[in-house]
Amino acid sequence: MGHAIQDVVSPIRMRLAQRIGWAIVWLALAAISINFLLTVHGKYSHLDPSAYTMFWSRRGWLWTHLGGGALTVVLGPLQFLTRWPRAFPRLHRWTGRIYMVGMLIACAGATGLIATSPAPFEIRSAFAATALTWLTTALVALIAIHRGRVAPHRNWMTRNYLVTLSPITFRILLQALIALELPPSPTTIAILLWLSWLLPLLVYEGAYRIVDLLRVSPAHPARMGARSSPAST
């Protein structure tokens, strides 16, 4: 009897711990994202060439990118609320569509910025790889949901949102580099751009595998006990 209660309580505790953990993660991401949006959009809120520097002649592409990106950063967390899709499926779908439109707008702005950028090839190619990864993860997520595969859709949209946050991750990595008094050369900047989405994806994949193992492992003792109980009687 005690083992049966323990077998039931353990998964409940695991789910509760998982929900609390994800809540902390999303709250932290929300705080960092809001700070990033206020800082970046505040910087370019005044039409001043000294604030825009090299983006002054390309401010149209810049604002296209920032406007679409702001939509995705703000709407992204709403899509991952546990009860949101079940309670408001139509609203969830429309919010997702607006998110996708925002992503396409941001990618259009990014394409214009990359095409007109005087930056070295390694930096432009790193930006292009980020945009391509962003679009690819969204496409795979869309294919999954059109096939009725909800779990893969959710996982791929999580990956997509981690790429959405790559500018914020890049900013954190760049500040860490400056704090270490290391010179931000073009090659270093390109490496940070790649790491800004590769590192979060690697961390997510590792955490996803660990959670899967934890979900499976409690079932093994129960199955073993079920198999051995007839013999013991």
Regions found by a protein language model. Name each.
Residues 2-233:
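Alpha-helical membrane insertion/targeting regions
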